[in-house]
Design a protein with these regions (language model features):
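Terminal hydrophobic/aromatic helix or amphipathic segment near a protein terminus
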Residues: 215-279
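Short, amphipathic alpha-helical "lid/cap" segments that border enzyme active or binding sites
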Residues: 62, 176-184, 298-309
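Hydrophobic residues in well-ordered beta-strands that form the structural core
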Residues: 101-102, 145
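NAD(P)H-binding glycine-rich loop region in Rossmannoid oxidoreductase-like domains
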Residues: 34, 39-95, 102, 108-114
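Oxidoreductase cofactor-interface core, primarily capturing Rossmann-like NAD(P)-dependent enzymes
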Residues: 2-31, 35-45, 56-58, 95, ...
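Amphipathic terminal alpha-helices
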Residues: 286-330
Length: 330
């Protein structure tokens, strides 16, 4: 089955932009439509169509999806929750869309470390995966999804590194352009990825990519030395679980919402760096990685770091705020 007409939901975000950039390399092979809310300030490249939609309206969504072969969901915010996401999917089915590319783009969502995160914070990714699996089994619409590790993380303006735990926990870092390349190849060749998720781990050897090796590679690339502070990630983990229980007691409004925010900052860190349980995402990833399936070549850590520095600049501050968590905050 060949896909020609591709609708990108959330085309102006990091992932949407990376996918569009990759698809545009094929010239006229793909007809791309970027779909946004009417309030969006998105300015599309000259070669793609821009269409606005009401994400709360089934008829508006269905009309936008008419004649589209694939819908690639890259939206963020409230529309990632279960009911809004299901509405988008149902509209795609009604419009005759062949492939739905799910809005995952995280780590392995079947891991318990991810599934325990409150849906109010991370969206309905797990339940949406199950819903799409059902549609695939019934032959109503094919689906796929793409996941990797964090796109990039180091705070370089002041040459300071925060190391969580020992710093030796394997990281499954996926450069953003690699996500774009993989998604593009998935749309170029549907059959191998129909009705299945794809997990990337493109840096080799993956078992040696850690905070410490990343730091040493950065220091070598920049010909400098970082100051280092160590963070007790086990304390963050313990406190985050306590706060999560408080959130469950308080609900999603008022104090409960504040408690959830604290817990999520801690659990987000622990999902990457905590070493104190049996959830071992390194082993999980080794079993499910599908780099070759989607045309992703293995790259050396040194090359990945150099490419990231060229792309973001030597003084970038990339997602640092996500990981800047102290146990006392919880």
């Amino acid at each position: 089955m060949e896909l020609k007409n591709i609708a990108i939901l959330g085309p102006g975000g990091n992932v949407g932009t990376a996918i569009i950039t990759e698809l545009l390399k094929d010239g006229p092979r793909f007809t791309i439509t970027g779909i946004t809310r009417s309030t969006s300030t998105y300015k599309p490249p000259p070669t793609i169509t821009h269409r606005t939609v009401d994400y709360t309206s089934f008829s508006s969504l269905q009309a936008a999806f008419q004649n589209q072969d694939a819908v690639v969901n890259c939206i963020t915010g409230g529309a990632t929750h279960y009911e809004p996401s299901k509405l988008i999917i149902d509209a795609a089915v009604a419009a005759g869309v062949k492939l739905f590319f799910a809005d995952e783009f995280v780590g392995e969502i079947t891991r318990e470390a991810f599934r325990r995160l409150p849906e109010a914070f991370v969206g309905g990714k797990c339940r949406i995966r199950e819903y799409l699996e059902g549609l695939g089994r019934e032959g109503k619409m094919a689906w796929t999804s793409l996941n990797g590790g964090p796109f990039f993380d180091m705070y370089m303006p002041n040459r300071h590194a925060r190391i969580y735990g020992s710093g030796n926990q394997p990281l499954h870092w996926t450069p953003l352009p690699t996500m774009g390349l993989a998604a593009g190849n998935m749309l170029r060749n549907l059959d191998p990825i129909r009705n299945r998720p794809v997990l990337l781990d493109p840096i080799t050897p993956s078992s040696t990519v850690t905070q410490n090796t990343l730091l040493r590679t950065l220091e070598k690339a920049l010909d400098t030395t970082f100051t280092v502070s160590h963070v007790d990630v086990s304390k963050i983990h313990r406190n985050a679980l306590v706060v999560l229980e408080k959130w469950k007691e308080c609900g999603e409004q008022g104090e409960g919402k504040a408690q959830m925010g604290k817990a999520m900052r801690g659990l987000g860190v622990c999902n990457q760096f905590y070493e104190g349980d049996d959830e071992g995402h390194a082993e999980d990833s080794e079993r499910t990685v599908q780099n070759e399936l989607v045309g992703v070549e293995i790259m050396q850590l040194e090359d990945a770091v150099r490419d990231a520095l060229e792309r973001y600049g030597e003084n970038c501050q990339v997602v640092q705020g996500m990981y800047n968590v102290e146990a006392c905050e919880l």
